[in-house]
Amino acid sequence: TLLLECFDCTNGATGRNHGLLHSGARYAVTDEESARECNEENMLLRKIASHCVEETDGLFITLPDDDLAYQAKFVEACTAAGIRADIIDPKEAKILEPAVNPSLIGAVRVPDGAVDPFRLTMANALDAKIHGAELLTYHEVTNLIIENGVVLGVEALDHKTKEVKKFYANITINAAGIWGHNVAEKAGVAVKMFPAKGALLVYGHRVNNMVINRC
């Protein structure tokens, strides 16, 4: 097994995220399938990569301008998706998370968490190498090697030497993430996916200890 990484591991979107390990609760009302899958992945990561996960838990809070009756619908949807969702007293929520909005009138505790994307990625890479895989960083896939409609391998640019190299394999997997549509196009396959920019505000310290969402 050979993994080609365009630059350093976690150099792209992998290392530029909020580090939130979703419980799936935020999707429960509108997309039960995604919520269930999210929760299953959450529990799996806690099991196989506990050293990369911080079990902070999360709060979905209701503010005075919100409809408190929605809380019951939210909890019901979470339960249907297999997600733990416990209604707690606002006073308890303030004790658990002192930084929460003090005007809250309702709170639901869910198994959200925090994940270290750098440590998790490198742990995956190390485990793969231990099991015989090879990892080449600074190797950008520039083309696919195709004969008679069959993908036989890839061409990759070594960003350090500027040399174009060819790698052949019985199976070639497109693991380019959000940029996967660019690789797919080289095989004449259209993937309806594109990256969307977002903004994150980064502090030099932690403001709150639990994940806080508005219910």
Mark where each language-model region is:
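Residue-level detector of anion-binding/catalytic polar loops
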Residues: 1-2, 51, 84, 134
